[in-house]
Design a protein with these regions (language model features):
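Short, small-residue-biased leader/transition segments that mark boundaries at the very start
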Residues: 1-5
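Signature of alpha-helical transmembrane segments and their immediate interfacial
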Residues: 6-34, 430, 498-550, 607, ...
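Transmembrane helices with small-residue packing motifs
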Residues: 12, 20-55, 78, 113-123, ...
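Hydrophobic transmembrane alpha-helices and their membrane-interface caps
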Residues: 25-31, 36, 342-411, 418, ...
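Extracytoplasmic/periplasmic membrane-proximal domains and adjacent transmembrane bundles
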Residues: 37, 48, 90, 116, ...
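Solvent-exposed, membrane-proximal periplasmic/extracellular interface segments of envelope transport
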Residues: 58-130, 191-212, 231-233, 571-653, ...
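Helix-loop junctions and hydrophobic alpha-helical segments within the transmembrane domains
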Residues: 319, 326, 330, 406, ...
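Transmembrane alpha-helices and their membrane-interface boundaries in multi-pass membrane transporters
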Residues: 395-409, 431-450, 457-499, 605, ...
């Protein structure tokens, strides 16, 4: 209290302190980074290893298993997953949020290097990268030309664009979609090879021997030293065609005699188009936790600088930019701050009806809000959706203390007290209430420090900003506000016309409230059933309201994944994807861009819609129309997906349910029954499983006895098939200073049926040519094209899209029921992706909610020196929560992280009203009034400040509850919860709290008399 008195007597000191807060806040605002959400990305390290020609089973046993075995011992791993497929293994190591990304990367590199001695000698060295292999790119630069081939465009994208973009800070990787990388293709003709007695292994050996450049030493003279360079490398198709393979009867056999070499694309089974025009796309993938907007700005800057380096006929555009939504969403929240500020000022003026009195909160609000940016700066936060929502909420909060303080001083001035004395006396009287409400609000957010996982990271920044704003506002209310009040407020001999016109309304409101309160206190027993009804409503509605991690937002982007049956050719999935692309063009002809990308076995179509303000339909409506339309396209399967608010994995549906088993045979047995129940469940719109057992394969069974007697080894047979059919790399060549692969393979036309393999020959140890058909037997079979591990167990992930109106919480409940019905005790289940984040956040939030209630009760008990008074105040909490749930239920709002933030906020907000009433009633008891009269007078005297502070909070959040534009659903969820809770609790608090107070509050009058 001495601080209030001292600062009222020292106005310059109070002003200087306020200016310092403003100055530091402005500095913080101008230096803060901008992003969509706080950094909630778990550190993820990916390990990839290629082994050309090996099937999934070989990859799993020889590469994935040794790598996983070594990586598994690293501390701090949250999940370890892998996929083994034809020619490649990908391991994703997800760490806990507390683990440093660089430390995690170094640990993984160390373990991978130790595991390399267990890997096959001819596999590529494993690569370690600081990102999820399935991470969603944030931006794509589309490279197109009317006159250049995709090979040339790919080279430009690689040498010019990629080289520049991958040096941007916090970029994990830059990939080229639709890339046609140069390679030297050696096409083999098995018939001609048989005629000349040449095998694929001979070709490989010739490349190894004839395409080599080794250090050749030097010639040292007396005055000159010459370095020798043996020009053994080949660079053109002509040189490769002229390679001598052998000599037969005095005639040399060149490669051109048994095949031909050509400069062509390494990947011939992929293409990419944007709006029907072939292209290559350079996509930027950020590191976990990176600032996406800073990366995008750097990309724009680099591309502008690169314009002069690109040929005139090469044009670039941006296929998609996910940061557009982030920027627009942040701008929407910023404009909401201004709207909330204006609405709060209007409500203050309508209640106080004096521009001098209104001016004081007008000055205090910016001080608290700008000061919050300094809190964000010293805490290392960023300007993001949640910190800006915290600022919006703070608009209604920070004004409360200033209003209560100003009104208390103004009442004394109106009674004839001099402004200076009124400032001191008013501040002294209200000091305890201001401190109590501030501590209560800050205590709400203390449990969030203990929250773990994604929700903990998200809540932490939000809570720190609100708590910081409230602390600054209480400091300003106790120092700057009394000083301003003594300078600005004067006793008016006659009120203005607006005051005179509106005063009858407020007097009438006081009379109506006084009469209704007296009537309610005569039947105060009603307070108990009303409270019980509210508690029952909470129990019923909490179960009824669907739950999810975050509401779906209109991000102006839709993705369609296409998949054909296992074993389908590249041409088949290409034609199906183009068919879906044409369908999309007919449904949304005004789309900004439609990008189609196809590779062997799958395709993807990314639709970028016009900005929200430029169209009269939503992303969700378009997604539903496309979903309905593609049901008639039954040649293959297509899945429509929309990006979730949290989580950066591409191609994943919201429900990710992992089945873990001790053997793949058990999974194969149970999956059909499990999937059948998922397909039949109305909660799910679509479903799929990553583990398939339908990929056709031809097994080559070797007759070892026969091979041994004929002088052939298993290695001879395996290498012949490997170099003839798998497209195995035979070496490297250099062109324009860059290294490219030499790929050998039999012509497609001569390996399109199993019978073609019979025409392949191998050479025995006696030099004789043996037809492969004599040594092997071909058996058709099926096998999984990809094998999955999750936390070291063989696994299958069932992915499901949700039906319209269903949430992830309902989906997981149904999955748990299906698992209980179909799986035995040898199976384990786990969650992945968004599902895992949702389940973890739900338990964490409930813990924070309960801890907040306990903390507030204990803090209030300490402040009031009573265990009864805090109980009275805490009764406002169920009233508020019931109000929030009623509004959420009627408004169709889900229980998500934003609405839950609002509900936790309500605990502190509504407790403030209870504190004001109980504190004033206690003061009146101590001044001699009996308990019933004290609570009547306190409630009546606090009516206007409570209504004013509640109205300012509600109006400050009205722009959230009725939000439009980017990110609107998140703001609506939070705004609806807080507005609904405040409206219901404010009305009921004015009756329930006095009634319960009259029952159980300590009789302080008696205590005073005793003393």
């Amino acid at each position: 209290r001495q601080m209030c008195i001292r600062d009222s007597r020292r106005p310059v000191l109070a002003t200087v302190l306020t200016i310092i807060i403003l100055l530091f806040g402005l500095i913080g605002y101008n230096t803060l980074g901008v992003r969509e959400y706080p950094s909630v990305d778990n550190p993820i390290i990916s390990v990839t290893c290629s082994y050309s020609g090996a099937n999934a089973d070989v990859i799993e046993n020889q590469i994935t298993e040794p790598l996983e075995q070594n990586i598994n011992g690293i501390p701090g791993i949250r999940s370890l997953s892998s996929v083994s497929q034809q020619g490649q293994c990908r391991i994703t190591v997800e760490f806990e949020l507390s683990v440093d990304l660089e430390t995690a990367a170094n640990d993984v590199r160390d373990k991978v290097s130790r595991a390399q001695r267990y890997l096959p000698r001819d596999c590529d060295p494993p690569t370690v990268s600081k990102a999820d292999a399935d991470a969603t790119p944030i931006l794509m630069v589309a490279i197109q030309s009317d006159s250049r081939s995709l090979l040339e465009l790919s080279e430009i994208a690689d040498l010019t664009v990629k080289e520049q973009l991958q040096t941007i800070s916090d970029v994990s990787s830059v990939s080229i979609w639709g890339e046609k990388r140069y390679s030297m293709r050696l096409w083999l003709d098995p018939t001609k090879m048989a005629g000349y007695g040449i095998t694929p292994v001979d070709v490989k050996n010739a490349i190894t021997n004839e395409n080599i450049e080794l250090p050749s030493g030097s010639i040292e003279g007396n005055t000159v030293e010459l370095t020798l360079r043996t020009m053994g490398q080949m660079h053109t198709a002509k040189e490769f065609n002229n390679i001598i393979l052998k000599e037969v009867g005095g005639r040399v056999v060149r490669f051109s005699d048994i095949g031909y070499a050509e400069l062509g694309p390494a990947d011939i089974k992929s293409y990419m188009k944007m709006n029907g025009v072939p292209m290559v796309g350079v996509v930027v993938i950020p590191q976990p936790g990176a600032n996406h907007i800073e990366i995008a700005d750097a990309v724009y800057q680099r591309m502008e600088q690169m314009k002069k380096d690109l040929p005139d006929d090469v044009k670039y555009s941006y296929g998609f930019d996910n940061t557009k939504f982030i920027r627009a969403s942040i701008d929407e929240v910023k404009s909401t701050v201004y709207e909330a500020f204006v609405l709060v000022i209007i409500i203050i003026f309508l209640f106080l009806r004096d521009w001098r009195v209104t001016l004081i909160p007008c000055i205090v609000i910016p001080v608290s809000l700008i000061g919050a940016f300094f809190v964000m700066y010293i805490a290392g936060f960023s300007i993001n959706v949640l910190t800006m929502l915290a600022v919006v909420l703070s608009v209604g909060l920070v004004v409360d203390d200033a209003i209560v303080m100003t009104e208390n001083i103004y009442i004394r001035i109106e009674r004839g007290m001099r402004p200076f004395e009124a400032g001191i006396e008013g501040a002294k009287e209200i000091f305890f209430a201001v401190i109590s409400t501030t501590i209560t609000l800050v205590a709400v957010f203390l449990p969030i420090v203990f929250m773990e996982g994604t929700s903990g990271r998200l809540f932490r920044e939000f809570s720190f900003v609100v708590a910081g704003s409230v602390i600054i506002s209480s400091f300003a209310a106790l120092t700057f506000t009394p000083m301003l009040a003594t300078k600005l407020l004067i006793k008016r001999e006659k009120q203005g016309w607006f005051y005179q016109k509106t005063e009858p309304f407020f007097e009438g409101m006081n009379r109506i409230y006084a009469r209704s309160l007296n009537a309610f206190l005569k039947r105060r027993i009603w307070a108990i059933p009303v409270t019980v009804i509210m508690l029952i409503a909470i129990g019923v509605l909490w179960v009824q309201i669907p739950a999810e991690m975050a509401p779906m937002e209109d991000r102006s982007q839709i993705s369609i994944n296409t998949r054909a049956a296992e074993g389908a050719s590249y041409e088949y999935i290409r034609d199906y994807t183009e068919d879906i692309n044409n369908l999309v063009d007919s449904i949304i002809p005004d789309a900004e861009s439609v990008t189609a990308r196809v590779s062997s076995g799958s395709g993807n179509i990314r639709i970028t819609l016009k900005d929200i303000k430029d169209r009269d339909y939503t992303q969700m409506e378009v997604a539903e129309r496309i979903s309905q339309a593609i049901r008639n396209k039954t040649k293959a399967r297509a899945f429509v997906q929309q990006q979730s608010s949290f989580g950066g994995r591409r191609g994943s549906m919201p429900v990710q349910y992992v089945l873990q088993a001790v053997s793949i045979e058990k999974l194969e047995k149970v999956l059909p029954a499990f999937l059948s129940k998922v397909y039949d469940n109305p909660t799910f719109q679509m479903a799929d499983v990553d583990l398939k057992f339908s990929s056709p394969e031809m097994r080559v069974n070797i007759n070892r006895d026969k091979a041994g007697t004929m002088g052939a080894t298993v290695r001879d047979i395996a290498e012949t098939l490997q170099y003839g059919l798998s497209g195995q790399r035979m070496g490297y060549f250099y062109m324009n200073g860059k290294q490219y692969e030499i790929l050998g393979q039999i012509n497609r036309q001569q390996r399109n049926t199993p019978a073609n393999i019979k025409s392949i020959y191998i050479r025995s140890d006696k030099g004789e040519m043996i037809q492969l058909d004599n040594l092997v037997e071909f058996v058709e079979s099926v096998a999984p094209p990809k094998l999955y591990h999750y936390n070291r167990f063989i696994s299958a992930t069932v992915s499901a899209g949700l039906a319209d109106g269903k949430t992830i919480g309902q989906g997981l409940e149904e999955m748990d029921k299906i698992a209980a019905q179909t799986l035995d005790e040898t199976f384990r289940t786990a969650l992945s992706g968004d599902s895992k984040d949702y389940r973890e956040s739900s338990s964490s939030l409930m813990f924070a909610f309960i801890l907040a209630l306990i903390l507030i009760y204990l803090i209030l008990a300490a402040q009031f020196e009573s265990f009864k008074d805090p109980f009275i105040i805490m009764l406002t909490v169920p009233l508020a929560i019931a109000g929030a749930l009623i509004f959420m239920y009627t408004g169709g709002i889900t229980m998500n992280i934003f609405s839950q933030i609002g509900i936790i906020m309500l605990i502190g907000l509504v407790a403030k009203n209870g504190i004001l009433i109980v504190e004033f009633a206690n003061q009146k008891q101590e001044s001699g009034e009996n308990k019933m009269q004290a609570i009547r007078d306190a409630a009546l005297q606090r009516l206007r400040p409570i209504l004013m502070t509640s109205a300012s909070t509600v109006l400050g959040l009205i722009p959230l509850a009725f939000a439009t534009g980017e990110g609107a659903n998140q703001r609506i969820a939070m705004g609806t919860a807080v507005v609904g809770g405040m409206l219901v609790s404010t009305f009921l608090t004015m009756y329930i709290v006095p009634a319960i107070y009259s029952y159980i509050s300590t009789n302080r009058n008696v205590k005073t008399e005793t003393v």
